[in-house]
């Protein structure tokens, strides 16, 4: 075991904990880089990246059906993706690149819910590179139409988890003694 000093506090970590802590630091750096790169891309790229993520998460039905709406005059919907294999249920997506450090406010969520109703949609996902204000979160939780909010940190975390926009740099194999072998 080795002692690490972090913010003035001394902690004793075993080697596995050290590896886990290192992976967390790497993921935090990659997440920040992902958000910066997403923000630097064109809106169409961001919308497609969001749909790619939802497909990687298993949405899109058996054929991986997802479609991006036209870039302008899209009626408040940026993409539509099948939730099930038969295409009976669809998820409507709003994908917005907002400045890092900014917040999506309640009126934007209200507008999205209005777009959902206008499309006779039963549910939606609003994904952004920014954060959501307390008012936006409260509104999304209280409105009868299910709306999932995914902010920048959650977006980056999901991209890492599902391998969208990232690649595996190295795989580490940890071993331990197999107690069953020696019985």
For each predicted feature, which ranges?
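Mixed-charge (Asp/Glu-Lys/Arg
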Residues: 1-183
């Amino acid at each position: 075991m080795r002692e690490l000093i972090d913010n003035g506090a001394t902690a004793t970590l075993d080697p596995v904990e050290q590896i886990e802590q290192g992976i967390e630091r790497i993921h935090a750096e990659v997440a920040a880089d992902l958000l910066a790169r997403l923000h630097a891309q064109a809106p169409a790229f961001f919308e497609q990246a969001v749909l790619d993520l939802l497909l990687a998460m298993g949405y899109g039905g058996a054929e991986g059906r997802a479609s991006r709406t036209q870039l302008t005059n899209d009626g408040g919907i940026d993409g539509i993706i099948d939730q099930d294999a038969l295409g009976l249920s669809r998820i409507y997506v709003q994908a917005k690149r907002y400045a890092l450090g900014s917040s999506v406010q309640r009126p934007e969520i209200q507008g999205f819910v209005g777009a959902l109703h206008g499309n006779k949609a039963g549910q939606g996902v609003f994904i952004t590179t920014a954060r959501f204000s307390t008012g936006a979160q409260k509104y999304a939780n209280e409105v009868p139409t299910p709306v999932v909010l995914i902010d920048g940190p959650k977006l980056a975390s999901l991209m890492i988890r599902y391998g969208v926009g990232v690649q595996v740099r190295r795989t580490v194999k940890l071993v331990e003694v197999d107690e069953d072998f020696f019985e």
